[in-house]
Amino acid sequence: MNLELFTELAGGLDHPEGIALGPDGLVYAGGEAGQIYAIAPDGTVEQIASTGGFMYGVVTDGDGNIYGCDFGRAQVSRISGSGAIQRYSNGTPDHPFRVPNFAAFDDDGNLYVTDSGGWADDDGLVYRVAPGGSTVVWSHEVPRFPNGCCLSAEGDWLYVIESRGRCISRIAIGDDGSAGPPEVAVELPGCQPDGIALAEDGTMFVGCYRPDRIYRIPPGGQPEILAEDPDGVVLNQPTNVAFVGPELDRLAVSSLGGWSVMVADVGAIGLALRYPKVGW
């Protein structure tokens, strides 16, 4: 099942769900007690903050701030490199965050945030948080537990995992920033997809909460199982994936069910991330 591809980058983390590469070359991950971890290339781990919540997806800006989807506090928390914690957004007055799950920046510093809602309620939302924290509901049309997300290379599509929909949907981003009608890009029956990362050639890599599986989906092609762990030892609820390293040539995988971040050479180069200067 290709598990031999994977080695441990770092261990001793508290059930990391989200993972992201920062502009400083460090890998950032969250923990189930609200921890924010910084992982050096040699695997050294430093806990730089804890919100006391439950950290899901994480993303960084061009100034080294970390934005964590804090399920425990129902907010997006902004954490500076020194560990100072601020509330960046808690949704809108009419639609406060319930399950902020993952986030992705565009070039202008707008942060797209998925809120999964209730598992069986199909009431998930996607928010758009402008630089500084002003927040609107951007789309309510991918309601089936929206989860991991990322922007296309050109920044004109937002790809969203719908975990309960067993699919990857995509939403066109208009010139004015508005959301177009969604369309299903890839069906993933028989699993619970969670996180997504794009390679520079458009290949999608998808981590699944159930079963312990990672998919590779070539452009215009069918999903292929890259790796699967029937014992949940190497890949233990591999919820999120991110390309890391100076050349973006290794795929890092978080383990919500365990304590480690694994990495593998999967024969692909990651799409360069956006690190906007957000200010605040």
Model-derived features with residue positions:
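A short beta-strand motif characteristic of beta-propeller blades
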Residues: L3-A10, G43-A49, I85-D94, S134-H140, ...
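Beta-rich, blade/repeat-based domains predominating
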Residues: A10-D24, A33, T51-Y67, Q75, ...
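Beta-propeller domains
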Residues: Y28-Q47
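Structural signature of WD-repeat beta-propellers
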Residues: G31, A40, F71, S80, ...
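A short loop-to-beta-strand structural motif that recurs across blades of beta-propeller domains
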Residues: Q35-Y37, Q75-S77, G124-Y127, C167-S169, ...
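Structural recognition of the beta-propeller blade-terminating site
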Residues: A40, I79-S80, A130, A172, ...
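Anionic-ligand binding region
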Residues: Y159-V160, R164-I196
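Short loop/turn segments immediately following beta-strands, especially the blade-tip
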Residues: I171-G177, D265-R274
